[in-house]
Regions:
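Aromatic (Trp/Tyr/Phe) and Gly/Pro-enriched flexible surface segments
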Residues: 59-137
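Phosphate/adenylate-binding glycine loop and adjacent helical scaffold
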Residues: 174, 186, 303-415
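Extracellular polysaccharide-targeting segments
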Residues: 50-74, 211-215, 226-307, 411-414
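Surface-exposed ligand/attachment interfaces on beta-rich extracellular proteins
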Residues: 13-17, 56, 77-84, 196, ...
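Extracellular carbohydrate recognition and processing domains
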Residues: 184-213
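Extra-cytoplasmic beta-strand recognition segments
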Residues: 69, 137-177, 203-211, 271-273, ...
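Intrinsic low-complexity, repeat-rich intrinsically disordered segments enriched
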Residues: 1-62, 275-283
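Beta-strand-rich interaction surfaces with strong enrichment in secreted/lumenal proteins
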Residues: 54, 128-129, 149-153, 187-194, ...
Length: 415
């Protein structure tokens, strides 16, 4: 018997399996449940799969930089932190303490979940159990507005923010993760748990149709993990369901653990990811070279701890690397310049270990009295004016080196 059978529903018997002969054309509006298609299946119209279409398909999903904690240009270990704000170890990770007596060590650690090589470890070294109302400590990453435009925040097409990361600690803890819109003073927070094992935290923050991000190279949004907070930030109701105008008391959970409650306390972090999506996707790994290039937009260091001076005979440190050449314009002033490998976010500030500067001129080494006087750098070139007490030969090119393995100069355009 041949012909056409029209039906509104096909239902399998028993196992609920329906077999359609090969070559049969079906006009299907909805397939529910968990269907399995075997063989070669051709779909002649659009197919909507929420678990795929709910997020970006393809690479470059992750907005965060150095999420796998690969790059540590400044240092792989710093102690006695907690008294000032800044970037100290992992690139793009900023520590922001306020009025706390707690202190900690930050290190690059080899403990990591499967598929990762590194994590950022914080280790409390001085406890602070008497928490003042205005105290806080959080780690953060700031993001340029021009890198957030695809979230369409402040429009009717606004997209959700999905944050994920891996954490562990010495004991159970509860901390608060916050997204803070700096352009419009809006925020939203959610809590997460830490155990003694590596776990992946997955947090979905809803879209915000109010307040667009500025399209520029300034900081528009801060991602923060609050590890310590006083009642000025914990006494309200945690703003966790939708974006709202920032109220200090609603930013941190009242159940937030204090990282400074004991010198036994540790906190490990890696696998940071931020994507425009309604689902969580696997971490997007990038090569070390890619990650280093992204980090160098904000910070570049030359010298320690990456100084690789080698003596061909003893393999001990020698002052053999010429970092740049200088042109003198009088007997005690020189200017050196070199192109940067990556254009920086803004005109950078410059710092230098003045005590370790060595100027070499006409066969003479000048090891003291040298200071960085003027930074004339641009986003694409370093231009450094060195003042010296030495009497230089103003007709010769002068080389800039260091007289110690701890010598360095750096350029910072951090947010």
């Amino acid at each position: 018997m041949t012909g056409i059978v029209k039906t509104d529903q096909i239902q399998g018997a028993g196992s609920s399996t329906v077999t359609i002969p090969s070559g049969t054309a079906l006009n299907v509006t909805t397939v529910s449940g968990t269907p399995t298609f075997s063989g070669a299946s051709t779909f002649s119209s659009d197919v909507t799969l929420p678990s795929i279409n709910g997020g970006q398909i393809g690479g470059r999903r992750n907005v965060f930089i150095n999420g796998a904690m690969q790059v540590f240009q400044r240092s792989t270990s710093e102690s006695s932190l907690g008294g000032s704000t800044g970037y100290f170890t992992a690139d793009r990770i900023r520590f922001k303490p306020n009025s706390t007596a707690g202190r900690f060590t930050s290190t690059k650690d080899s403990s990591a979940p499967n598929g990762f090589a590194n994590s950022l470890k914080l280790d409390c070294t001085t406890a602070d159990t008497s928490i003042g109302a205005g105290e806080y400590f959080f780690l953060s990453q700031k993001i340029e507005g021009q890198d957030l435009q695809h979230f369409a925040k402040g429009t009717s097409d606004a997209k959700p923010f999905t944050v994920s990361f891996y954490v562990k600690g010495n004991a159970s803890a509860t901390y608060t993760c916050e997204l803070y819109d700096e352009d419009n003073t809006r925020q939203i927070s959610k809590t997460f748990s830490v155990t003694t094992n590596w776990t992946r935290v997955e947090l979905l923050f809803p879209a915000d149709t109010t307040g667009a991000f500025d399209n520029d190279n300034n900081s528009s949004m801060t991602f923060a993990i609050w590890l310590h907070a006083g009642t000025n930030y914990t006494s309200g109701t945690l703003n966790s369901s939708s974006w709202a105008s920032a109220t200090a008391a609603n930013r941190v959970s009242s159940s937030n653990t204090s990282f400074f409650d004991s010198t036994d306390r540790t906190f490990f972090l890696t696998g940071l990811q931020l994507e425009t999506s309604s689902i969580v996707t696997p971490f997007e790994h990038r090569t070390f070279g890619e990650e280093l290039t992204l980090c160098r937009r904000y910070y570049q260091r030359y010298g320690y701890p990456f100084t690789a001076f080698r003596n061909s005979t003893t393999y001990s440190w020698v002052d053999a690397t010429i970092w740049f050449l200088c042109l003198p314009f009088d007997a005690d002033d020189v200017v050196g310049s070199h192109a940067l490998p990556v254009e920086m976010r803004a005109i950078p500030t410059a710092t230098m270990t003045d005590a370790y500067i060595r100027l070499q001129n006409n066969g003479q080494n000048y090891n003291s009295g040298n200071t960085l006087q003027v930074n004339g750098s641009s986003t694409s070139h370093a231009s450094l004016h060195i003042d010296t007490s030495a009497g230089l030969n103003a007709t010769n090119v002068i080389s800039f080196t260091f007289n110690n393995s701890n010598g360095y100069y750096d350029l910072s355009a951090e947010l």
